Amino acid sequence: MKAFYGILIIFILISMIHLSQQVFINATCTLTSQCRPKCLEAIGRPNSKCINRKCKCYP
């Protein structure tokens, strides 16, 4: 059972590090497809979402 909790803590820490790599750029949007070219230009990858009318880029 101790191993399970250890693995769970490691998983949570890795998830937190991964989520902290998200980048909000100062670009307005209404659809996620509008963010793709902007994120490609900003960080070099088209992985993105439109959240609260702001583009969020993922590495």
UniProtKB/Swiss-Prot annotation:
InterPro entries according to UniProt: Scorpion_toxin-like_sf, Scorpion_toxinS_K_inh
Domain of life: Eukaryota
Residues the UniProt record annotates as site (Basic residue of the functional dyad): K49
UniProt note on tissues of expression: Expressed by the venom gland.
GO molecular function annotation: ion channel inhibitor activity; potassium channel regulator activity; toxin activity
Subcellular localization, as worded in the UniProt entry: Secreted
Gene3D superfamilies assigned to the protein according to its UniProt record, in alphabetical order: Knottin, scorpion toxin-like
Site (Aromatic residue of the functional dyad): Y58
Entry note about domains: Has the structural arrangement of an alpha-helix connected to a beta-sheet by disulfide bonds (CSalpha/beta).
Protein name as catalogued: Putative potassium channel toxin Ts24
